[in-house]
């Protein structure tokens, strides 16, 4: 049986911590194949080029998606997310993942989730239903609504996902993976 291809998009050092252990488990499985896609701040020198940390941890990215158009304005962010979605569409078309695994609530992860959803790639979301109290919280809830499998970190978060109308059989209270 061919291994199932699990794409993981990682965009920043903070969320990398959430998926690192899971990525090691995917790599150890004979039934799964890791397809690591690196984007966002990982690729920027001004944020420490944290892609180097990923490589030092033993991972080989299947793809890198440069996305930033420059600037930190709302317009620049919106344009950058559009660039990311175009790049991810090409990568997903090439890799043909069976599932996209994402974590957190950053805009880059929302763009990845939207792209996968429109390409009929099922999405699993680590940290569904958490609260942050800022714009990223809205992104997290949008990611949750687009995801097919929900992996909240606690029962309160799982309850929020259920209250959003998600089917209970799709919700797995797994705790925080880091």
Question: Model-predicted segments: where are they?
Answer:
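Active-site-proximal region of nucleotide-activated glycan assembly enzymes
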Residues: 121-178
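N-terminal subdomain of nucleotide-sugar transferases
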Residues: 1-42
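Short N-terminal targeting/anchoring amphipathic segment
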Residues: 90-106
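PLP-dependent amino-acid enzyme catalytic core
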Residues: 2-3, 27-29, 60-63, 75-95, ...
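Structural motif
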Residues: 9, 37, 102-104, 126
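An aromatic- and histidine-rich active-site surface loop
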Residues: 101-118
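Conserved nucleotide-sugar phosphate-binding/catalytic loop shared by glycosyltransferases and other
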Residues: 33-77, 87
């Amino acid at each position: 049986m061919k291994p199932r291809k699990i794409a993981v998009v990682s965009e920043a050092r903070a969320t990398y911590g959430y998926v690192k252990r899971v990525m090691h488990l995917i790599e150890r499985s004979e039934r799964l194949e890791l397809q690591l896609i690196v984007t966002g701040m990982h690729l920027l020198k001004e944020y420490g080029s944290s892609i180097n940390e990923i490589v030092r941890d033993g991972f080989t990215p299947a793809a890198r998606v440069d996305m930033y158009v420059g600037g930190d304005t709302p317009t620049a962010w919106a344009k950058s997310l559009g660039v990311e979605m175009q790049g991810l569409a090409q990568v997903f078309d090439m890799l043909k993942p069976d599932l996209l695994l994402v974590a957190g609530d950053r805009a880059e992860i929302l763009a990845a989730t939207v792209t996968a959803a429109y390409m009929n790639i099922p999405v699993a979301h680590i940290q569904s239903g958490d609260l942050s109290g800022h714009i990223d919280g809205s992104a997290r809830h949008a990611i949750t609504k687009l995801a097919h499998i929900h992996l909240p970190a606690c029962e309160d978060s799982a309850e929020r996902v259920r209250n959003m109308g998600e089917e209970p059989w799709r919700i797995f209270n797994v705790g925080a993976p880091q």
